[in-house]
């Protein structure tokens, strides 16, 4: 049985998250004053494609995340913040991708309250036990992606290559369709491209420690509490006992 068999089980989420079948897709929806949805397509046992449309600042975390899942996350719009197993925070913004097997430790946060993205979930254990014929024929290797991006120890964060972005745009156009065959082909092609693209390092630091994030959030609260008050960098640095930079 796949590690993802319960990954999107509604019983593992708060009551305001519902899961229902919708044609050839499964839709997970967050109801309430703020909302969002994940539209999920099963490509093969152990391979799931998700179209994410989030209109809230916080998306709930499942009670327990599934083990040994390779997650490829591509941001189209907005920004996502997530706490990782190693105590660091990762920030994924428009035009960037994240690839790895690290587990999220807290709710996913979306500061702007708007996020659009595409995700691919690959169960490494299941795909090793029961390989996906399309991956085999197309020479797509999840293990090869892990090795190429060095994600066995750390989440890979970097710009989405232009050729990958083109495929993401094609996939996004099909987000509300039921063209599962085409979704499978485009997903396999996308993975093939990711595995073979030269590594690019973003000039922007995208990892932060929990203390850095706490300081940033508290600083935001101070600045927004009374916009008529001016606070200098020196004042805030002294308050948190850190350098102005």
Protein language model regions, located:
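N-terminal low-complexity or simple alpha-helical regulatory segments
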Residues: 1-67
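Generic structural motif
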Residues: 43, 54-59, 77-79, 123-127, ...
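Short hydrophobic beta-strand segments that form the core of ligand-binding sensory/regulatory domains
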Residues: 51-53, 71-73, 116-123
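Glycine- and acidic-residue-biased ligand/ion/polar-headgroup-sensing regions
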Residues: 66-86, 124
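Alpha-helical bundle regulatory/interaction domains
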Residues: 83-212, 216, 224, 233, ...
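Flexible coil/turn residues that form the inter-helical turn or adjacent wing/linker of helix-turn-helix
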Residues: 229
